[in-house]
């Protein structure tokens, strides 16, 4: 189980790299009015792939680590900030971000012009990135803090 937590932590950083790359690429593409490139496509493809891997690992952790069991006692679980965060908030926000990344990828692929691809990229992937940043249990978030890097 600890191996999955370490992987979940490390993949978070890959997701953030590709998310920022995708959003910055969309902003620069809109500003410069350049053509949508293979690099732009790859950034959101890798963003989506790592989100898929992260979701799979996260679901395994969720169902094997007892967070799902907390739903049986939802009233008590909601009183504890850490249990509430990992049982409801983190998982729901990350699933919403995952949906936005997939919807964004489909929408960008269907867009006819480079400018519309960049606009859709900025909208979908920008909102997904914002949700991800909110849903991560950063070390400075007192009740739910997790380390910057988790090692074995």
Place the predicted regions along the sequence by residue.
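Membrane-embedded alpha-helical bundles that constitute the cytochrome b-like, heme-associated redox core
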Residues: 1-152
């Amino acid at each position: 189980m600890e191996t999955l937590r370490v992987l979940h932590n490390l993949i978070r950083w890959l997701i953030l790299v590709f998310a920022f790359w995708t959003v910055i690429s969309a902003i620069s593409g809109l500003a410069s009015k350049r053509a949508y490139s293979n690099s732009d496509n790859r950034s959101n493809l890798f963003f989506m792939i790592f989100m898929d891997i992260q979701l799979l690992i996260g679901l395994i952790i969720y169902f094997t680590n007892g967070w799902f069991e907390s739903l049986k006692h939802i009233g008590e679980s909601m009183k504890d900030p850490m249990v509430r965060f990992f049982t409801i908030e983190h998982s729901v926000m990350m699933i919403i971000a995952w949906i936005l990344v997939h919807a964004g990828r489909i929408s960008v692929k269907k867009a006819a012009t480079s400018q519309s691809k960049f606009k859709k990229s900025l909208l979908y992937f920008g909102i997904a990135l914002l949700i991800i940043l909110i849903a991560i249990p950063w070390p400075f978030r007192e009740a739910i803090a997790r380390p910057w890097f988790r090692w074995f």
